[in-house]
Amino acid sequence: MPSYRPPKIASSEITPRRIYMRRREFLGAAALGAVALYGAGKASAAALPAVESKYKLDEKPTPLKDVTTYNNFYEFGLDKGDPAANSGAFKPLPWTVKVDGMVNKPGTFDLEALMKEFPIEERTYRMRCVEAWSMVIPWDGFPLASLLDKVEPLGSAKYVAFETIVRPEEMPGQKGFFQSLDWPYVEGLRLDEARHPLTLLAVGLYGETLANQNGAPIRLVVPWKYGFKGIKSIVRITLTDQQPKNTWQVTNPQEYGFYANVNPAVDHPRWSQASERRIGEGGFFGASRHPTLPFNGYADEVASLYAGMDLKANF
């Protein structure tokens, strides 16, 4: 597998090192003495004792206010502000994740136990939505590969399927207009994609546990794919030998595919993917636009996964 090399970052995106280190010192102090990583089962954010990893980029992140108020999470509503407005009743704790299917050691795992077993890393990734907007987000989490190693996939396993929780009493979008979707929300990856070092199970961002609107308490982050692959509030992970269909692929197969790799050369049927609107940047005239990079800037690390594939046909 190619060694990791950070995507090229424009100088305008760089955060001064002294400011970055002060933030880390503050978060580290806040995490000292914490009895539980999430606090007493509250939905409010709690500090995470995350450590920097080799994937940590010294980028200027999207402001926290934008990251937590401009979201797609249809379980809570259709508008970008709905998840923040409508997710207050959602209870992210206690939480377990069931891992089953083609594995030697299936099980149902307590999330807080997993967070103690696997070191929490801080990684800053670009996030590119299929709607042609983007953010730069400092995530906290552990590699999906760590959990997969724990359950020991069988040699016959080829894919990994993911499932979101169904709680219509706490997630109003599941009983509103979008109840026509086949809940639960589901997603999938090839096993080699799931095991790639960049693929993260995020449990926090900006050094704190995930807010409900960002996918609390655990979500998938695959930085070279469009954001809809980042399934939120995961309760089940299944290893299989069949390619799983994702929710949007089932709903509209002409517009959404299985792979969803960021590709400026393959337009969405209704808009161009050649550039993106960076949320949190720009002034009076709106957010600035950036050229979209193949695989969202991670081509050196992941392009080999798709060698010989027709990326237009396998969108």
Curated annotation (Swiss-Prot):
User: What are the names of the required cofactors?
Assistant: Mo-molybdopterin
Q: Name one GO biological process term.
A: protein repair
Key word Coiled coil present in the record? Answer: no
Q: Coiled coil located at which positions?
A: none
Cysteine pairs bridged by disulfides in the record: none
Q: Does the keyword Cell cycle apply?
A: no
| First-level EC class | oxidoreductase
Check the record and name the SUPFAM superfamilies matching this protein.
Oxidoreductase molybdopterin-binding domain (SSF56524)
Q: What are the GO cellular component annotations?
A: periplasmic space
EC annotation from Swiss-Prot or TrEMBL:
1.8.5.-
Tell me what reaction this enzyme catalyses. Answer: L-methionyl-[protein] + a quinone + H2O = L-methionyl-(S)-S-oxide-[protein] + a quinol; L-methionyl-[protein] + a quinone + H2O = L-methionyl-(R)-S-oxide-[protein] + a quinol
**Post-translational modifications reported in the UniProt record:** Predicted to be exported by the Tat system. The position of the signal peptide cleavage has not been experimentally proven.
User: Which InterPro entries does the UniProt record give?
Assistant: MsrP, OxRdtase_Mopterin-bd_dom, OxRdtase_Mopterin-bd_sf, TAT_signal
The Gene Ontology terms for molecular function here are: metal ion binding; molybdopterin cofactor binding; oxidoreductase activity, acting on a sulfur group of donors, quinone or similar compound as acceptor
Which controlled-vocabulary keywords does the entry list?
A: Metal-binding, Molybdenum, Oxidoreductase, Periplasm, Signal
User: Where, in this chain's numbering, is Mo-molybdopterin bound?
Assistant: N71, Y74, E75, C129, T164, N214, R219, G230, I231, K232
Q: What family is this?
A: Belongs to the MsrP family.
Say what the protein does.
Answer: Part of the MsrPQ system that repairs oxidized periplasmic proteins containing methionine sulfoxide residues (Met-O), using respiratory chain electrons. Thus protects these proteins from oxidative-stress damage caused by reactive species of oxygen and chlorine generated by the host defense mechanisms. MsrPQ is essential for the maintenance of envelope integrity under bleach stress, rescuing a wide series of structurally unrelated periplasmic proteins from methionine oxidation.
Protein name (record): Protein-methionine-sulfoxide reductase catalytic subunit MsrP
- Origin species, per record, is Rhizobium etli (strain CIAT 652)
Q: Which gene encodes it?
A: msrP
